[in-house]
UniProtKB/Swiss-Prot annotation:
Pfam families: Ribosomal_L37ae (PF01780)
Species per Swiss-Prot/TrEMBL record: Plasmodium falciparum (isolate 3D7)
HAMAP family noted in UniProt: Ribosomal_eL43
Metal-binding keyword on record: yes
Record's protein name: Large ribosomal subunit protein eL43
Amino acid sequence: MSRRTKKVGLTGKYGTRYGSSLRKQIKKIELMQHAKYLCTFCGKTATKRTCVGIWKCKKCKRKVCGGAWSLTTPAAVAAKSTIIRLRKQKEEAQKS
């Protein structure tokens, strides 16, 4: 039997085609795409991608919309942190 690929991993299916830099980018994206993520509802690491932008937890059966390749996008993380910061400022202003 032949040895499995160590360096190329998932992108071994492309062989020598498309160039090494593009295959490295694809490898990074495909690893994120096929990974399991932490469910925000039940706390288990069971959320997987069903199709583009739709993620489903296998434990609690919840469906969540997110990024195309990863559960959260940088823009969504920035927006969420901004909302949390503004809520804290509003609460502090009401207390004073």
